[in-house]
Structure formats: C-alpha cells, structure tokens
Amino acid sequence: MIKQRTLKRIVQATGVGLHTGKKVTLTLRPAPANTGVIYRRTDLNPPVDFPADAKSVRDTMLCTCLVNEHDVRISTVEHLNAALAGLGIDNIIVEVDAPEIPIMDGSAAPFVYLLLDAGINELNCAKKFVRIKETVRVEDGDKWAEFKPYNGFSLDFTIDFNHPAIDASTQRYTLNFSADAFMRQISRARTFGFMRDIEYLQSRGLCLGGSFDCAIVVDDYRVLNEDGLRFEDEFVRHKMLDAIGDLFMCGHNIIGAFTAYKSGHALNNKLLQAVLAKQEAWEYVTFEDDAKLPMAFRAPSMVLA
C-alpha cells in the first residue's frame, strides 16, 4: 500500500518576511493521518488555522495568500507548498509567528532541506491522489492552462516575457515529475522581480523584505544579482515551481499532464478549481499494490531513509 506521509520530528527555522522585512520563526510539525496541510498563525490569539484549500487562495502582486471567512490571511505560502508537493507530504502543521511564511532565498530549496532534516514518516493509512479523467482548460486572454489524463505527473510550461535578460534564456521547460527531479531541477529556482517595482513598493512600505538575497532582480536590461542565475532558464523553472505549489493547494498530489502558457498563480488556481468543480473530470485513487503507482510518485530512497 502507498502510505500517507508526515514528518518524523518537529523542525524550526527563521527567515525574513517578504512584506514586513521582519524576522519570522517557522515551525514544521508532524500531523496524524488525514489531517492534511494546515498553515497556522501563532501571532494571533487564539491561533488561526488555514487548511490548504483551492477556494481559500487569493493571488496578490507579491505572493499567494490563504484567506479565511473572517478575511484573516496568511501570505507567501507558495514556495513551501511546492516543497510539500515535491516530497509528497500529506499531513503537516506549518506554524509561523507572523502574517507570512518567510521568503528564505526566494526558492523552495531551504524548505526541502528543512523537510529532509525533519525526516519523513509513513503513516499506516492509504495516500489519496487526485487522478485527472477528462481534459479541463482555462483561459485568460492569450494565457491558458490545462490538465489532461496521464498516468504520472508531467508539466510543460512556457513563459513569454518581453525582456532582454529573459528573452536570452529558454522560455519553455518540461518536466516528468518525481521527487528527485523536483529537488534537482526545480526546487532551487528563485522568484524574480523588477528593480523598479521593488523600489516603488518599498516607497509605499510594502515588500520590505525584498532584496538580492531572496529574488532574481532585473532592471530593464539585465540581471542585477552579482552571482547571476542558478540555471540558464531559472525564470521559467521558477514559474513551474510556483505551479507545482499552486496545484498542491487541493492537498493531494495530482496524476495528470499539466500544460501552461504564460500562466501564473491566479490562472493555476482557476484551473485547479475548474477541475475540482467538474465531478466527472477527476477521482480520488489509492494504491494497494505498490507496483501500480506511477513512477512519478515512487519515493526516492533518500527521502524515506
């Protein structure tokens, strides 16, 4: 049987909030089977829980937020959510003593290291996947995203930024997903932003944690970071990282083929909601026979060591 996963032990890290620029303490806690992914703000009294849920997602210029019925929000969840998807973590409590998850280096890699440091524990309960049964597509002008049936998890993402530094890079990336492929090829890709946008936001008291330490920063012509890019095509790889996190907002790994053109957080979420709203387009599946599990979701030995 393919089992649900949680952490072996509690781990903690500190970072900076993208919005406030203030120190944030992040605590990752194991959780029992069928808990799901729960984000928790401990800076509020009493603490407020935000279960990962496609319908709770709000996209802002800076990040993805989860918002509850009282309009309380937790921000910048997308990169940690991608790390959870990458390692197939089904049950976890994510605590922060702030309104946002720390931005770390702008990628998912620090969260992957933290999760691996905690260790991954298999629970004696079948892991549920969402399997795509019918093609579902959403569009917004010339942008689009779609899911098709496929016995695995594949991603094909194209961006189209009219910018010299981004034009010079490859703007399409394809991935046959696995935990190993995610860690090696996707997790280290950082978010990117324009210097003029960051300066404007900071002049208004926003994005106070934005810096060269947590993003690729570009001006009108080039990448400004002294160390340059981690990958030649880091821009499109990061958009794929975002999509992996966005699509895991249903709390389950998805079996299907994802293709997107110029998509972002909002359109990825719109696709996920469109799939879930169409009952005949998907189903929950479990795997009693390990041999029938798509290769995409075979646990790498290092994860369950």
Curated annotation (Swiss-Prot):
Pfam families associated with the record: LpxC (PF03331)
Lipid metabolism found in the keyword field: yes
Residue ranges that the Swiss-Prot or TrEMBL entry lists as coiled coil: none
This protein's UniProt keywords: Hydrolase, Lipid A biosynthesis, Lipid biosynthesis, Lipid metabolism, Metal-binding, Zinc
Catalytic activity: a UDP-3-O-[(3R)-3-hydroxyacyl]-N-acetyl-alpha-D-glucosamine + H2O = a UDP-3-O-[(3R)-3-hydroxyacyl]-alpha-D-glucosamine + acetate
GO biological process, one term: lipid A biosynthetic process
Entry keyword Metal-binding: yes
Pathway, per record: Glycolipid biosynthesis; lipid IV(A) biosynthesis; lipid IV(A) from (3R)-3-hydroxytetradecanoyl-[acyl-carrier-protein] and UDP-N-acetyl-alpha-D-glucosamine: step 2/6
Ranges annotated as spanning the membrane: none
EC identifiers of the protein: 3.5.1.108
GO molecular function: metal ion binding; UDP-3-O-acyl-N-acetylglucosamine deacetylase activity
Signal peptide residues on this chain, from the entry's feature table: none
Residues annotated for Zn(2+) binding in this entry: 79, 238, 242
CC terms in the record's Gene Ontology section: membrane
SUPFAM superfamilies with a match to the protein in the record: Ribosomal protein S5 domain 2-like (SSF54211)
UniProt cofactor(s): Zn(2+)
Active site location: 265
NCBIfam families with a match to the protein in the record: lpxC (TIGR00325)
Primary role: Catalyzes the hydrolysis of UDP-3-O-myristoyl-N-acetylglucosamine to form UDP-3-O-myristoylglucosamine and acetate, the committed step in lipid A biosynthesis.
Family listed: Belongs to the LpxC family.
Protein name (record): UDP-3-O-acyl-N-acetylglucosamine deacetylase
Organism from which the protein derives: Klebsiella pneumoniae (strain 342)
Chain's gene name: lpxC
